[in-house]
A protein has these predicted regions:
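Conserved beta-strand segments of the P-loop GTPase G domain that flank and frequently precede/overlap
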Residues: 1-3, 34-36, 237-240, 269-272, ...
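Residue-level signature of catalytic and energy-coupling elements of molecular machines
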Residues: 33, 84, 122, 168, ...
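Conserved GTPase G-domain signal focused on the G5
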Residues: 164, 276-280, 295-305
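Switch II of P-loop NTPase G domains
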Residues: 9-22, 208-230, 242-255
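Conserved C-terminal guanine-recognition region of P-loop GTPase G domains, centered on the G4
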Residues: 41-48, 223-290
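Conserved P-loop NTPase architecture
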Residues: 1-154
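Single conserved hydrophobic/aromatic residue that forms the stacking wall/gate
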Residues: 306-314
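Conserved G1/Walker A P-loop phosphate-binding module
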Residues: 109, 116, 121-124, 131-212
Length: 314
């Protein structure tokens, strides 16, 4: 633990903590260090030179996980766009041209394609990727128009990463979408039709999980995917009640919804993973229109889900 009045501009941490890390790196024979914050290019370079090992900041780690999870062409485009924006923002500190990106820690994606990461080629590639994403966005718009004409309500599943959105989608629709406890196991949106116990037919869409301190360029890159929540009629906010940081995660979701300008939608909070609790958790989310204790694993509460014109909780 180190308490500083300000973050060191060159190495993020102070000289004393840097010396401690040097000893730890040698003792553990470490090949890499992960920093749970975003580092500037100067800080990345300073730490790598001082510690003589690979440094990954929070954003680079998230990008690496995204690259490993991307399956569809759209997901891969969005990941590459976010990676290149990250690289572009750091070129000034690392020089006008970086060496070719190879495989290994922190370099998945553009490195595997042997991209030259100088400014000119990055700008050209970003322009191309944005054009491709615009085509995807237009295609999504056509699909949304078709859904609108069908007059079937659309509900978007949102939540902090690993809250159990895909598991709920599977439990509700009988589908077999990949559901994993891994971070960001879902990068691509999936829509399934569902008839609720009250007979109401809806379309249910899974979305990418949110996370605390999600960088803005990641939100921008995945905007076409996140727009599914923006254009939905209802929001089903899935919460992992077994997580000790549940309240923080819920706030992150609401902050992200606000940034996406969808916080005014009708929201039903699904307090998931009740099967992991010693006693049922009945908590009213006063920011939502309704709250319901559920378990995707056991089916608890799923038959009670109702989204027709919910009334704001008092």
């Amino acid at each position: 633990m180190q308490v500083r009045e300000a973050i060191h501009p060159g190495t993020y941490i102070g000289k004393g903590k840097l010396e401690e890390l040097k000893i730890l790196v040698r003792a553990c024979d470490a090949t890499g260090i992960i920093c749970d914050d975003e580092l500037s290019s100067i800080q990345l370079k300073g730490l790598e030179e001082a510690l003589e090992c690979k440094i990954m900041d929070r954003t680079l780690l998230i990008l690496d996980i995204f690259a490993a999870r991307a399956v569809s062409s759209e997901g891969k485009i969005q990941v590459e766009l976010a990676q290149l924006k990250y690289r572009a923002s750091r070129l000034s500190g690392l020089g006008t041209s970086l060496s070719r990106l190879g495989g290994g820690i922190g370099t998945r994606g553009p490195g595997e394609k042997k991209l030259e990461t100088d400014r000119r080629l990055i700008r050209t590639r970003i322009t191309q990727l944005k054009r491709e994403l615009e085509e995807v966005r237009q295609h999504r718009e056509l699909l949304r128009e078709g859904r609108k004409r069908s007059k079937i309500p659309v509900a978007a599943l949102v939540g902090y990463t690993s809250a159990g959105k895909s598991s709920l989608l599977n439990a509700l629709t009988g589908s077999e979408i990949l559901a994993d406890a891994m971070l960001f196991s879902t990068l691509d949106t999936t829509t399934r039709s569902l008839t609720l116990p009250d007979g109401q037919e809806i379309l249910l869409t899974d979305t990418v999980g949110f996370i605390n301190k999600l960088p803005h360029h990641l939100i921008d890159a995945f905007r076409s995917t996140l727009e599914e929540a923006r254009y939905a009629d209802y929001i089903l906010h899935v919460v992992d009640t077994s997580n000790p940081q549940m309240e923080l995660q819920m706030q992150v979701v609401y902050d992200t919804l606000r940034e996406l300008k969808v916080e005014d939608k009708k929201i039903v909070t699904l307090l998931n993973k009740q099967d992991k609790l010693l006693a049922p958790m009945v908590v009213k989310d006063f920011r939502a229109d309704a709250s319901l204790a559920v378990s995707a694993k056991t089916g608890q509460g799923l038959s009670l889900i109702h989204i027709s014109e919910p009334t704001r909780q008092e």
